[in-house]
Amino acid sequence: MTDVLPGSHAGTPEPELRLVLLGTIGCGKTLSGDTLLGQASSGSPFASGSSPRLCQLRRGASEGRRLTVVEAPRWYWNGGHMEAGVRKETERALELASPGPHAFLLLVPVGQFTEVERRVPTELEEVFGEGVLKHTLVLFTCGDYLMGRGAGQYLEGEDPGLREVIDRCGGQYHVINNRRPQEREQVRELLEKVTMTTIPSYNGNDNNGSN
């Protein structure tokens, strides 16, 4: 008997999405992975030999899709650039999301945009190639901090640099509240945005996508 994911139909191959979560310290990558997959991670990210300086790979099923979620290492900066060791490990995310991620999710906590985040799009192009921003969506975490405001209203009062980052990522953004992981509509909407705006997957060569 073939297992069928919730919300899917027997005989239909389940669509797969491969996502890479990127961001600085404290942006909420692990919690966002929990929310996306609808499951809690197994213990502390420091447990079982894991390290915040290494990529973490998780797989599961969510909202009728098979998900591969790669959590890139915490970003540490040396002057104006990412540390060499962290950059090398970040590059490994492409391998873990083989044949290539469908989207890079750039996590930015609500109300915590800094000069570091302003530099990230350029850094991503240096790490993954010029085509990466076409496959990047800004994911605002700590959505509860909006206190009922819409994302558009929030952006109007923020540093113009945040809008610039979003524009460089094709204008794509989404808000997630990891304090309410049971609200699955926020996950469905995010996965739909990824499906509509970033397919095919990215393998480091913008002229050679895969499925």
Regions found by a protein language model. Give the residues of each.
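Switch II (G3) loop of P-loop NTPases
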Residues: 42-44, 66-89, 120-121
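Canonical P-loop GTPase G-domain recognition
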Residues: 148-200
